[in-house]
């Protein structure tokens, strides 16, 4: 989640059960440390030819976490069905990487409204807040014991999801013509974990983009919930898992002992059930560079550049 430059690599798409390049499981020491240098002006500050921006502030119910949400609206008129809309976690880092070149590319299709949900900080990541907000309570150990220098409180995904769906989304969508059939959610690492948990727990969104979800940080039990899904409850939702093939010297796959078999079983069951899930492989990208590549791909997908999903539990897309 950490490299600040865009990557131009396009993913090779495969059905979700292809395991050859699946590297979801990681230990803390194998994650590159985040680039925590303070951020400068972003595209909202500089201005765009293709989008206009607004910023809204929110607080958590307990008053301990404070959010800054950027809403980017296309300068083009909304289609009759409304704009697609993509909610993006780690919004500070997203806004730091968003540029007019990508916005131009989106505008050539059906440009989405972009909602970057970040925190009230000048840093790219609020490490403590995201560790709490993005991790599921059911699988939580209350603190992130794999965090190295920190022991971060975890397990707040239900509270954050309620904030996102009942306060943030209604506020930012007010007055906009939104296509609710094309409302999506993207997240990377812990954010990817939140997206996967949200796919299981909520039908507020239709498209769920989970990039490099941190299943290996003690959250692999989430796979049991995935395995148990009833397909009829997921017919209207679409899940895309995005992962990079391990680069040379990246030995994350060596930590997958005892877990890869669970993933294999889970993905096979999903395939057999005909659930609308896909796996997108990004060759030669590690965990950090997947932040840029995956959020770009999610935006392009929801804008309609890539093949559209089709409803129906037995029609696998892509």
Residues covered by each model-derived region:
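A domain-start/cap signature at the N-terminus of enzymes
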Residues: 28-83
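Alpha/beta-hydrolase fold nucleophile elbow
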Residues: 177-188
């Amino acid at each position: 989640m950490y490299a600040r430059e865009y990557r131009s690599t396009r993913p090779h798409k495969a059905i979700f059960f292809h395991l050859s390049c699946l590297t979801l499981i990681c230990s803390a020491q194998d994650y590159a440390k985040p680039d925590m240098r303070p951020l400068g002006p972003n595209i909202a500050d500089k201005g765009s030819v293709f989008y206009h921006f607004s910023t809204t502030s929110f607080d958590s119910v307990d008053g301990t976490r404070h959010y800054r949400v950027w809403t980017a609206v296309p300068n083009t008129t909304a289609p009759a069905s409304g704009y697609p809309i993509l909610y993006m976690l780690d919004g500070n880092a997203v806004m730091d990487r968003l540029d007019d070149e990508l916005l131009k590319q989106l505008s050539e299709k059906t440009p989405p409204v972009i909602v970057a949900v970040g925190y009230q900080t000048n840093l790219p990541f609020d490490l403590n807040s995201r560790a709490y907000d993005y991790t599921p309570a059911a699988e939580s150990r209350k603190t992130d014991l794999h965090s190295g220098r920190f022991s971060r409180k975890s397990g707040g995904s239900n509270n954050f999801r309620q904030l996102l769906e009942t306060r943030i989304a209604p506020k930012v969508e007010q007055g906009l013509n939104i296509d609710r059939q094309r409302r999506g959610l993207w997240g990377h690492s812990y954010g990817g974990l939140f997206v996967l948990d949200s796919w299981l727990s909520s039908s507020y969104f239709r498209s769920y983009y989970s990039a490099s979800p941190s299943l290996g940080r003690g959250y692999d039990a989430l796979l049991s919930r995935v395995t148990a899904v009833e397909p009829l409850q997921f017919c209207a939702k679409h899940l895309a898992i995005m992962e990079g093939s391990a680069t040379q010297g990246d030995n994350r796959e060596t930590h997958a002992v005892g877990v890869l078999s669970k993933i294999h079983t889970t993905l096979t069951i999903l395939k057999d059930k005909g659930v609308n899930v896909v796996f997108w492989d990004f060759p030669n990208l590690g965990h950090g560079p997947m932040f840029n590549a995956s959020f770009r791909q999610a935006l392009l997908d929801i804008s309609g550049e890539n093949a559209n999903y089709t409803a129906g539990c037995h029609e696998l897309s892509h």
